[in-house]
């Protein structure tokens, strides 16, 4: 059982205007969290807080302190490696074909730029892959507010996808250190993609989700090639980053190959969700009419 400890709070019924200077200067300890939010075991820091918001102290099942602030123990999971990696949506309609060939066209410059540097390729892929879920979730959130209706859980499902993809990036940042020009490329690619996807989702959610479905199929292919290079010895099979071991509940002696396997499984789950979404639209329904696959990965 995961445990969260909160410091005991004083009376909170008084107005903040009535609080005296001593309360204003009260220091609230940061619970040993690293300033970076990554929880890397660095020095403890404290903050001066007028508002008295208590930091939580999270412990593992064995009672030891949880060191990550960017995710919590109840958000970790074991990846389902049994998922079918070969599934493919054959494009039949005009929108399907447009989505398919758009993704295929985007693959060529990526192949040319990264070639067989799969660590950097994975890092760049995840900076883009984390965008659609956030954009789609935000637009569905606004739609839910405008129409005074539930989303069927799709807001949460898409935001979960975005967070999961972001954790992929945080993991590969530990493995592949990007050069300055690769960081600059992230600014350019992300700036273009987030706006393009935003407009696409406004015009046609089913096209937007289909594009992501095909992007995830390409991601599965990329990680499969990554595994082949690891097996050939062309890429060093280094120990798995600590963040990956805790996030996917991997054994302590896990390696980069184990990380790539679980990431590829995640991408296969995202593929299924994003191909499922346009199928709902094609059958004359809205996403809210079909329960969202929350926690599917």
Swiss-Prot record:
Its EC number is 1.10.3.11. Residues 17-43 are annotated as: Disordered. GO terms for cellular component: mitochondrial inner membrane; mitochondrion. This is Ubiquinol oxidase 2, mitochondrial. Its cofactor is Fe cation. Coiled coil: none annotated. Pfam families: AOX. Fe cation 2 binds at residues 165, 216, 267, 270. One of its GO terms (molecular function) is superoxide-generating NADPH oxidase activity. Homodimer; disulfide-linked. It comes from Nicotiana tabacum (Common tobacco). It is a multi-pass membrane protein. Keywords: Disulfide bond, Electron transport, Iron, Membrane, Metal-binding, Mitochondrion, Mitochondrion inner membrane, Oxidoreductase, Respiratory chain, Transit peptide, Transmembrane, Transmembrane helix, Transport. Belongs to the alternative oxidase family. The keyword Iron-sulfur does not apply.
């Amino acid at each position: 059982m995961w445990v969260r400890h909160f410091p005991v709070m004083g009376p909170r019924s008084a107005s903040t205007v009535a609080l005296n200077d001593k309360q204003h200067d009260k220091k609230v300890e940061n619970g040993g969290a690293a300033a970076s939010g990554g929880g890397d075991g660095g020095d403890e820091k404290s903050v001066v807080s007028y508002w008295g918001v208590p930091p939580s102290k999270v412990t593992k099942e064995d009672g030891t302190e949880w060191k990550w602030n960017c995710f919590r123990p109840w958000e970790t999971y074991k990846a389902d490696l049994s998922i079918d990696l070969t599934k493919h949506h054959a494009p039949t309609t005009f929108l399907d074909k447009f989505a398919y060939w758009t993704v295929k066209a985007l693959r060529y410059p990526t192949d040319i730029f990264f070639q067989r540097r799969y660590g950097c390729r994975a890092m760049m892929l995840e900076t883009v892959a984390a965008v659609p879920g956030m954009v789609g979730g935000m637009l569905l959130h606004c739609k839910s507010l405008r129409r005074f209706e539930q989303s069927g859980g799709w807001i949460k499902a898409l935001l979960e996808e975005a967070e999961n993809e972001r954790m992929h990036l945080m993991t590969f940042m530990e493995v592949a250190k990007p050069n300055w020009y690769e960081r600059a490329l992230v600014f350019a690619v992300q700036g273009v993609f987030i706006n393009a996807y935003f407009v696409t989702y406004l015009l046609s959610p089913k096209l937007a989700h289909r594009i992501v479905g095909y992007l995830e199929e390409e991601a599965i292919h990329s990680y499969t090639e990554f595994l082949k290079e690891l097996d050939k010895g062309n890429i060093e099979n280094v120990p798995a980053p600590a963040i990956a071991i805790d996030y996917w509940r991997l054994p302590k002696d896990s390696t980069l190959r184990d990380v790539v396997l679980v990431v590829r499984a995640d991408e296969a789950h995202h593929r299924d969700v994003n191909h499922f979404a346009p199928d709902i639209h094609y059958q004359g329904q809205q996403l809210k009419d079909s329960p969202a696959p929350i926690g599917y990965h």
